[in-house]
Amino acid sequence: VHLTPEEKALVIGLWAKVNVKEYGGEALGRLLVVYPWTQRFFEHFGDLSSASAIMNNPKVKAHGEKVFTSFGDGLKHLEDLKGAFAELSELHCDKLHVDPENFRLLGNVLVCVLARHFGKEFSPEAQAAYQKVVAGVANALAHKYH
């Protein structure tokens, strides 16, 4: 992903303030509520019968935290996202058979969650930078599919 120094500073600076546990659970929960067909990958998580059940499901929260932790780790490798996400790409492609479009959807949900929590601090410039990053991460995660 090519970011200007200003964009990189916005992304890294804002991510340092992210509550990975809370926001990660919220993002994965929102993905499952907004795009219900994604639930088929998480049927073993128990009750996904309603928005409330999903948003309060401890397994959804825990996996969301894991997703955000991986995303944060990826931010340390913006110049080589494909390398940073190679193992996860392989796992999601070969073992889990996740539709790579879901990575793009989750990236957009991640941006929504950041906007919700950071309000005015999540400026149009910050959003533009994050959109570049989530597109790059989605592309890296889909790499094994090509």
From Swiss-Prot:
Which family does this protein fall into? Belongs to the globin family.
Cross-referenced CDD domains, in alphabetical order?
Hb-beta-like
According to its UniProt entry, this protein's organism is Trichechus inunguis (Amazon manatee)
GO CC terms, sorted: blood microparticle; haptoglobin-hemoglobin complex; hemoglobin complex
Function noted in UniProt: Involved in oxygen transport from the lung to the various peripheral tissues.
Q: Which residues carry this modification: N-acetylvaline?
A: 1
Q: Which Pfam families match?
A: Globin
Name assigned to this protein:
Hemoglobin subunit beta
Q: Where is the signal peptide?
A: none
- Where expressed (tissues)? Red blood cells.
Biological process GO terms, please?
hydrogen peroxide catabolic process
Instruction: Locate the S-nitrosocysteine modifications and list their residues.
Output: 93
Give residues where N6-acetyllysine occurs: 59, 82, 144
Q: Does the keyword Thylakoid apply?
A: no
Q: How does it assemble?
A: Heterotetramer of two alpha chains and two beta chains.
Q: Which Gene3D superfamilies match?
A: Globins
* Source superkingdom: Eukaryota
Which InterPro entries does the UniProt record give? Globin, Globin-like_sf, Globin/Proto, Hemoglobin_b, Hemoglobin_oxygen_transport
